[in-house]
Amino acid sequence: MSRIQEILKRAEREGSVHRTRPFAAEGPAVGSPSAAAAATVPMPAMPPLQAPEPRSVEAALDRRLVAAFSPQSLAAEQYRSLRTRVKSAEHGRAMRTIVITSPNKGDGKSLTAANLALTMAQEFQHRVLLVDGDLRRPAIHGLFGLSDTPGLSDVLRGGASIDDALVALPEHALTILPSGPLPSHPAELLGSTAMRRLLETLRTRFDRILIDMPPVAPLADVSIALGMVDGLLMIVRAGVTPKPAIERALSGLDLSKVLGLVLNDAGTGSASYGYGHEYVAG
């Protein structure tokens, strides 16, 4: 049995299933240039990264962020369960940086990333950063009622310092790095030396870094950036995302970094999660 088939079988067999409120599909695509392997391109030097002093704001959060608005709800409890499973999947490896993605658009990846980040930030003295790495259809700033600039693309292109781009939400003990303006070559930017340097620096300042990234198919963004992070969660819409689409998405990834599948069913008025940390190759 192939590794991909093993992941799918275990997701069906071992994933715990819970019911909670539905996720809404994400917004319309801004544009999706064809995928291509990141070329080595000269990148402008980033401004020196100093001790972060993020802007503090009172964000107008989307009501679907149940981890903030309804922390005692069943829906919020499922995010806490997912947080626990991510921790148990570490197997002695430090999962400081985790990519959140999906096979296709509309699977609810951004909402999952936002709620999971809020839940992780609720842990005592846990420094959590949520990065909007979807430089094609950014959604994180909208969920938190923030401006998308300055942001990640500004920092990577040398147009802003990390201090300018980070946004602190003191009430939720969470820090956000918005997307910034949409670049013309997002895959190359995400695979750049500047991105690697930025993540190395952020790892020293945060306990968890969640990166919301574009869907895997048909884009190269995730596969290019995967070598810079510790793990990946794949968000799948139960009953909607075709199994071949999941297989195609997994086939282009380093499966040793796939922590598991999160099953999200938005079409029936409920959401279910199946997550199996045993999917991970040791």
What are the residue ranges of the model-derived segments?
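P-loop NTP-binding module
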Residues: M1-G282
